[in-house]
Amino acid sequence: MKVYEYDNSTEDQREDHDSGAVVSEAALNEIGVLAYHFDSVDDVNALAAERGYKNRDEVTISPSALGDIYEDKVKAFFHEHLHEDEEIRYILDGEGFFDVRSKDDSWVRIRLSKGDLIILPAGIYHRFTTDKNNYIKAMRLFQEDPKWTPLNRDPLVDENAYRKAYINSLPLA
């Protein structure tokens, strides 16, 4: 896992976009993002039991898995959005990026590869993309029934109860 400030270039979203400014694990934790590396699914199972994740599935994001809808899906995942549930992903194979908003609303890029697990809190604005290899396989974990409902960023979503709860959970500057 590699975490850094996004360079804000308009190049292909699947490029590294590494500004060279490293972001610490402590800084991620301050915005509610938890990151782990597990070599064994047994460790994932232990975390799932501890945090009450009852359901899971697997998803492969690649041109061969998604066919003609691949490019549209990758573009949709890259729209800035939030969820009303935690987003938990354990990377089984391949690589990709989660971009999350920092406290000052800039982008932080998290490069994930096999064995990495990330937990995004409900209400955090984020986006996702594969890397330039166009392939990632991930386990998605859920506290309740599997669902993925994005709320794209706009002024109304800024007033969402989960967004407000997330903002109120952040430590003061």
UniProtKB/Swiss-Prot annotation:
<keyword id="KW-0028">Amino-acid biosynthesis</keyword>
<feature type="binding site">
    <location>
        <position position="83"/>
    </location>
    <ligand>
        <name>Fe(2+)</name>
    </ligand>
</feature>
<feature type="region of interest" description="Disordered">
    <location>
        <begin position="1"/>
        <end position="20"/>
    </location>
</feature>
<comment type="similarity">
    <text>Belongs to the acireductone dioxygenase (ARD) family.</text>
</comment>
<dbReference type="GO" id="GO:0005506">
    <property type="term" value="F:iron ion binding"/>
</dbReference>
<keyword id="KW-0560">Oxidoreductase</keyword>
<keyword id="KW-0223">Dioxygenase</keyword>
<dbReference type="InterPro" id="IPR027496">
    <property type="entry name" value="ARD_euk"/>
</dbReference>
<dbReference type="InterPro" id="IPR014710">
    <property type="entry name" value="RmlC-like_jellyroll"/>
</dbReference>
<dbReference type="InterPro" id="IPR004313">
    <property type="entry name" value="ARD"/>
</dbReference>
<keyword id="KW-0539">Nucleus</keyword>
<comment type="pathway">
    <text>Amino-acid biosynthesis; L-methionine biosynthesis via salvage pathway; L-methionine from S-methyl-5-thio-alpha-D-ribose 1-phosphate: step 5/6.</text>
</comment>
<dbReference type="GO" id="GO:0016151">
    <property type="term" value="F:nickel cation binding"/>
</dbReference>
<feature type="binding site">
    <location>
        <position position="126"/>
    </location>
    <ligand>
        <name>Fe(2+)</name>
    </ligand>
</feature>
<feature type="binding site">
    <location>
        <position position="126"/>
    </location>
    <ligand>
        <name>Ni(2+)</name>
    </ligand>
</feature>
<feature type="binding site">
    <location>
        <position position="81"/>
    </location>
    <ligand>
        <name>Ni(2+)</name>
    </ligand>
</feature>
<dbReference type="GO" id="GO:0005634">
    <property type="term" value="C:nucleus"/>
</dbReference>
<dbReference type="GO" id="GO:0005737">
    <property type="term" value="C:cytoplasm"/>
</dbReference>
<feature type="binding site">
    <location>
        <position position="87"/>
    </location>
    <ligand>
        <name>Fe(2+)</name>
    </ligand>
</feature>
<dbReference type="InterPro" id="IPR011051">
    <property type="entry name" value="RmlC_Cupin_sf"/>
</dbReference>
<keyword id="KW-0486">Methionine biosynthesis</keyword>
<dbReference type="GO" id="GO:0010309">
    <property type="term" value="F:acireductone dioxygenase [iron(II)-requiring] activity"/>
</dbReference>
<keyword id="KW-0533">Nickel</keyword>
<feature type="binding site">
    <location>
        <position position="87"/>
    </location>
    <ligand>
        <name>Ni(2+)</name>
    </ligand>
</feature>
<dbReference type="GO" id="GO:0010308">
    <property type="term" value="F:acireductone dioxygenase (Ni2+-requiring) activity"/>
</dbReference>
<comment type="function">
    <text>Catalyzes 2 different reactions between oxygen and the acireductone 1,2-dihydroxy-3-keto-5-methylthiopentene (DHK-MTPene) depending upon the metal bound in the active site. Fe-containing acireductone dioxygenase (Fe-ARD) produces formate and 2-keto-4-methylthiobutyrate (KMTB), the alpha-ketoacid precursor of methionine in the methionine recycle pathway. Ni-containing acireductone dioxygenase (Ni-ARD) produces methylthiopropionate, carbon monoxide and formate, and does not lie on the methionine recycle pathway.</text>
</comment>
<keyword id="KW-0963">Cytoplasm</keyword>
<dbReference type="GO" id="GO:0019509">
    <property type="term" value="P:L-methionine salvage from methylthioadenosine"/>
</dbReference>
<feature type="binding site">
    <location>
        <position position="81"/>
    </location>
    <ligand>
        <name>Fe(2+)</name>
    </ligand>
</feature>
<dbReference type="Pfam" id="PF03079">
    <property type="entry name" value="ARD"/>
</dbReference>
<keyword id="KW-0408">Iron</keyword>
<keyword id="KW-0479">Metal-binding</keyword>
<protein>
    <recommendedName>
        <fullName>Acireductone dioxygenase</fullName>
        <ecNumber>1.13.11.54</ecNumber>
        <ecNumber>1.13.11.53</ecNumber>
    </recommendedName>
</protein>
<feature type="binding site">
    <location>
        <position position="83"/>
    </location>
    <ligand>
        <name>Ni(2+)</name>
    </ligand>
</feature>
